A protein has these predicted regions:
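A short beta-strand-turn-helix
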Residues: 50-104
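Short pre-active-site segment immediately N-terminal to redox-active cysteine/selenocysteine motifs
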Residues: 102-104, 109-113, 177
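Thiol-based oxidoreductase modules, predominantly thioredoxin-like and allied folds used
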Residues: 132-147, 157-167
Length: 220
């Protein structure tokens, strides 16, 4: 029985790794890995992006064009390309830079097995508790837009929900597991990341850790 259990656990872990490998898009060889699964550089600067609000009428793919042209690892606009993500008109869009004024929690999810939809119920409940102190963004990856819009209404989510139609943000952030969480300091640098389903108490504890880390950083 113990051997059978070990085999099952091993297969589950292998499946997680395979899914991560399939969904992760590496860059130019620097800093490759899966967010929440592999070690990220300290205070990694979250790349800019803008996505349509899931319940809105704005159509189109995510804008992942960056302001910083010194980096070749992320898309950087030239004069003939679209405006950087954080400079587009805000109407109908969620610009991640607008969320950098407070500590930030981003929940990346897709509806391909597991309990990722139910996990967003947990995220929404914690969002309501910390609203005004911590910013939250629930980011759907590549699901049907109408289905996501219906989910928001049916489940009564109040948190901001963005729509990454073509998976560009997922690739930029190296998301390979559902759900994936990114916890960021004000200003948009990574404090920590995690993968897998968690309950409201554990997510609240992670948010409290983020708030405490933010206070320490502000004092230093």
């Amino acid at each position: 029985m113990r051997d059978r259990y070990s085999v099952i656990v091993g297969l589950i872990f292998l499946a997680v790794i395979v899914v991560a490998a399939i969904n992760t898009l590496g860059g130019d060889g620097e800093g490759e890995g899966t967010l929440g699964l592999d070690r990220m550089p300290a205070r990694w600067a979250l790349p800019a992006f803008a996505v349509p609000a899931a319940t809105g009428t704005l159509e189109g793919d995510a804008n992942v064009a960056q302001d910083d042209c010194a980096s070749s690892a992320i898309p950087c606009p030239h004069a003939d390309r679209r405006d950087p993500a954080c400079r587009i008109p805000p109407a109908g869009a969620i610009r991640v830079c607008d969320l950098f004024d407070r500590p930030l929690v981003i929940s990346f999810w897709f509806d391909r097995g597991g309990e990722c939809v139910e996990q967003q119920d947990v995220v929404d409940s914690v969002y309501r508790r910390y609203r005004g102190r911590v910013n939250f963004l629930s980011l759907d990856i590549r699901n049907d837009r109408d289905a996501v819009r219906d989910l928001v209404g049916e489940r009564g989510w109040e948190m901001p929900v963005g729509y990454d139609r073509d998976g560009a943000v997922s690739a930029l952030y190296r998301v390979g597991v559902c759900p994936t969480f990114a916890y960021a300091y004000p200003g948009g640098t990574l404090q920590s990341a995690g993968i897998g389903e968690i309950g409201a108490a554990e997510l609240s504890a992670r948010v409290e850790d983020l708030l405490a880390a933010t206070r320490r950083a502000e004092r230093s």
